[in-house]
Design a protein with these regions (language model features):
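Acidic, PIN/NYN-like endoribonuclease modules and their adjacent C-terminal/linker elements
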Residues: 2, 71, 103-135
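Active-site-proximal, substrate-binding regions of enzyme catalytic domains
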Residues: 25, 45, 52-73
């Protein structure tokens, strides 16, 4: 099963944002052990760097990102995904781009804590806890 992991869930893990970090850790453990195929969008990686750069020194942050990216694949956000996001007219453009990335990389689900922003998505959005219960 292939899942696109939304930025907020990745930040829950890497920023140790409790109480959400527990379910995020379980999700990434499934990726690490190969039980699921986890994907983050290319924009998620830049967002993570931007959000954590004031909390973690640069070298440590690069190491954290390298380890993180050894566990998940990076999905492209190219012109096709950007134009698809624009066409969707979603109120949250960033989430529309995530949705398009999920579609183009063949994800079965988008795992996110803000499912309401993905109502118009072609790929079903599901919370980390709901996803873990499905397995």
């Amino acid at each position: 099963m292939r899942v696109l992991i939304d930025t907020n869930v990745a930040l829950d893990l890497l920023g140790d944002r409790r109480p959400f970090s527990e379910s995020a850790a379980k999700l990434f453990e499934l990726c690490e052990t190969g039980k699921i195929d986890g994907v983050v969008s290319a924009t998620t990686v830049t967002d993570i760097y931007y959000m954590l750069r004031k909390m973690i020194d640069r070298e440590t942050l690069y190491s954290v990102l390298e380890k993180f990216l050894s566990v998940v694949d990076v999905g492209d956000v190219t012109g096709g995904e950007v134009f698809g996001a624009l066409k969707s007219r979603n109120a949250d453009f960033e989430d529309a781009a995530q949705s398009e990335c999920a579609r183009s990389c063949g994800a079965d689900y988008i795992v996110t804590r803000n499912e309401k922003d993905f109502i118009r998505s072609k790929v079903q959005a599901i919370s980390p806890n709901e996803f873990l219960e499905k397995l």
